[in-house]
Amino acid sequence: MASMSTVFPKPTSFISQPLTKSHKSDSVTTSISFPSNSKTRSLRTISVRAGLIEPDGGKLVDLVVPEPRRREKKHEAADLPRVRLTAIDLQWMHVLSEGWASPLRGFMRESEFLQTLHFNLLNLDDGSVVNMSVPIVLAIDDQQKALIGESKRVSLVDSDDNPIAILNDIEIYKHPKEERIARTWGTTAPGLPYVEEAITNAGDWLIGGDLEVLEPVKYNDGLDRFRLSPFELRKELEKRGADAVFAFQLRNPVHNGHALLMTDTRRRLLEMGYKNPILLLHPLGGFTKADDVPLSWRMKQHEKVLEDGVLDPETTVVSIFPSPMLYAGPTEVQWHAKARINAGANFYIVGRDPAGMGHPVEKRDLYDADHGKKVLSMAPGLERLNILPFRVAAYDKTQGKMAFFDPSRAQDFLFISGTKMRALAKNRENPPDGFMCPGGWKVLVDYYDSLTLTGNTKLPEKIPV
């Protein structure tokens, strides 16, 4: 069977607007119209040629030092002032180094930070703009700032004090934590997972500059073979002859409703005239909140789904997206979409309440469930990307399988929430037949069994540095 590092599919659904094929050549042009509430744009139409689209800025950024120069750069790094990276800092460095944030070339300087925070974009030298909705910044404290002094370069080191990167032509500026939190999350309520992990106790200064990463980032956790860079993904997609790439991000186990959505999306793309649409199944691999299923268990579950034939390995590429999860709703989902452009995707699948979470204080969702997909259809810098909102899938009791929800017979459908799914797995109970493949469900049960054995109700996964 095909290796899991080169295959996979997941949930999707399709827009109701017509998609049209150009008959002038073998290439396909999609035209998708989105209604907008903007007074200046009552309708938005996107046209994208078949195949892989250009990365933002026209060229993928690669910030890893070429191998012949690594020894020299390591010697340079040894003599520079040092900034120690946290696990989340390392994940952002990984993101930057491989070009997921192209054309960004390092941790943000103040002008880039302000453009991102206030406008959700970056202005390029040629007058064009690219989407950039979340700040990618590095915090330092007063002591680190003093040690850096007048130096224009610093060495970034891991938890063992080993140099792993150099930051050049640096700029140090104030870290406006409250404003950053308010503008990114839309609230400063206590209990935001990423804020508590990475911002609240971070330094009061930010340091930006051009990044040189001394070696490719490896986690040595048995999953590195799934961590394909944008360059590697594009190479794999071209090798497969993809004429359309539809990306789906997830941080949860795959059930048969997801598979239905994914296969339906591919069917619709084939009906449009595409000959070989490929799914990029792209689970998030960075920081997640404590009650999410850890990455290693999610990847085991995804593999079983593939082995059980729920997903087609020939038309799916499975890879890990190294970004941390912010749970910043419509703001963050723009980042998720933008990064997939750099990986070659021209279609992005978006579901209900993408990148959302429950309000940390009040008993409600933090974000409107429909705002994510609406924002993506209007966001500056994402015009080249076709947005595919989910169709709602639920368990059809009359058919004994996952199916698209039919409101005319709502009584026939059962919605199995993530909370319900976790409760069933924790209690070693089986879901209805047809909800999830048996192999995938067993992985989920085994995960919750492992928590019971350790005496924990939840065992957060340590992120290696």
Swiss-Prot record:
One of its GO terms (biological process) is hydrogen sulfide biosynthetic process. Belongs to the sulfate adenylyltransferase family. This is ATP-sulfurylase 3, chloroplastic. It catalyses: sulfate + ATP + H(+) = adenosine 5'-phosphosulfate + diphosphate. Residues 1-49 form a transit peptide. It comes from Arabidopsis thaliana. It holds the Pfam family PUA_2. One of its GO terms (molecular function) is sulfate adenylyltransferase (ATP) activity. Induction: Accumulates in roots during S starvation, but decreased after SO(4) anion restoration (at protein level). Repressed locally and systemically by phloem-translocated glutathione (GSH) (at protein level). The keyword Plastid applies. Its EC number is 2.7.7.4. One of its GO terms (cellular component) is chloroplast. Keywords: ATP-binding, Chloroplast, Nucleotide-binding, Nucleotidyltransferase, Plastid, Transferase, Transit peptide. Its main location: plastid. The keyword Transit peptide applies. Homotetramer. It is found in: Plastid, Chloroplast stroma. It is an enzyme of class 2 (transferase).
